[in-house]
Amino acid sequence: MFEHYSVLKEESIKGLAIKPDGIYVDCTTGGGGHSLEIASRLNENGQLFAFDQDKDALAAARDRLSTYADRIVFVQSNFRGLEEQLKKHGIEQVDGILFDLGVSSPQLDRGDRGFSYNHDALLDMRMDQSQHLSAYEVVNEWSYERLVSIFFSYGEEKFSKQIARKIEAYREQQDIKTTHQLVEIIKDAIPAPARRKGGHPAKRIFQALRIAVNDELEVFNNALHQAARLIAVNGRIAVITFHSLEDRICKQAFKKWSTDKPTPRHLPIVPESHQAPFKLVTRKPITADTSELDENRRSRSAKLRVIEKVSEWDHEFTYEEGWRK
């Protein structure tokens, strides 16, 4: 059964400031926990679009949310298709958008999808099972230089070169097919003193592979800019991130959108044309309280940021790669 603990659920729902007759989007439906809270606050005129690229997650959510089926549209799609999918349904503006990033608990706990270093399984890590690229192709076919790049950039792994070199040597003898094989290679590449601290030695590499396979950072950055275009005045965007790379993208975008354009110093007030179209609802990210941390240890790295649109603006919110800097 697809069961998933929804992180920062109360805080994110409060952050969205849901209107009963509003239109909302859950970009990462998962097990449906956040979607359930949103749908239960809508009346017959409200609508929720529940996105997920994982068909198993969407099927489970459909069952869980059957009570509110009259106000939910389920969309099997990566949120990179946010604008395209909503336009198919005649939707050009919405009142709230939620992103809950990262891997869902069932994908980690089941182990058969290759996301977890705690379960032996075929190397996969595809959120969308219909796509070709998997962790197997990345590990066995990508060059040493490319592996070093993703391990360092996406995993912030200081032993990136040593691990990539071990992978390169191993695959010359045989393919690396399973998560267990990869974990042992990683352990062998990291000096013993370093293996004994900082969590599981494979954690950063598995994160890097998952991000690379699913193009997570590029997709999120693109979708966040789509969200800025879609959100109506007084509408809100709420984002739950789980590592510094995602949070950096969100933080930089929110800061830019909530900052007024530069104006001449002699002007007594900021002209309306120079005023930022968004305001920060959360000046600092919200994190899990002690009770949630006791209930779900995966909440410890979660950060919630919320922003509200206060006016239309001539800025196009085009896709940028500034988060890399």
From Swiss-Prot:
Pfam family, one: Methyltransf_5
Gene Ontology CC terms, in alphabetical order: cytoplasm
Domain of life of the source: Bacteria
EC annotation from Swiss-Prot or TrEMBL: 2.1.1.199
Disulphide linkage map: none
Binding site for S-adenosyl-L-methionine: 32-34, 52, 79, 100, 107
Subcellular location(s) per record: Cytoplasm
Keywords: Cytoplasm, Methyltransferase, rRNA processing, S-adenosyl-L-methionine, Transferase
Identification of the protein by name: Ribosomal RNA small subunit methyltransferase H
Gene name in the database record: rsmH
